Amino acid sequence: MTQQSNTERKPRAKGPKRPRKPKVDPFSIGELEITDYKDVKMLRRFISDTGKILPRRRTGLSAKHQRRISQTIKIARQLALLPYTEKLVRK
């Protein structure tokens, strides 16, 4: 087996192929309110299938609201309202 040298490789595309539209923070436009750690249905929007907290680039939240959501999710996990991890996800 031979390896390709750096000069023979195809150049990688730089950046996204199409511009992404900016995500809007649902809390700043009044669509959602961070009410309480007991609102599990709202908190599940910000958790992945495996139980991880989604990053800002996926949720579109501002830094302030992302910190607040993270703390609220962690409180709900400690009170056993949300799981720390989900069971094995099969596709």
UniProtKB/Swiss-Prot annotation:
InterPro entries: Ribosomal_bS18, Ribosomal_bS18_sf. The keyword Ribosomal protein applies. Residues 11-21 have a biased composition (Basic residues). Residues 1-27 are annotated as: Disordered. One of its GO terms (cellular component) is cytosolic small ribosomal subunit. The keyword Transmembrane helix does not apply. Keywords: Ribonucleoprotein, Ribosomal protein, RNA-binding, rRNA-binding. Gene3D superfamilies: Ribosomal protein S18 (4.10.640.10). Binds as a heterodimer with protein bS6 to the central domain of the 16S rRNA, where it helps stabilize the platform of the 30S subunit. PANTHER family: 30S RIBOSOMAL PROTEIN S18, SMALL RIBOSOMAL SUBUNIT PROTEIN BS18M. Belongs to the bacterial ribosomal protein bS18 family. Part of the 30S ribosomal subunit. Forms a tight heterodimer with protein bS6. This is Small ribosomal subunit protein bS18. It comes from Deinococcus geothermalis (strain DSM 11300 / CIP 105573 / AG-3a).
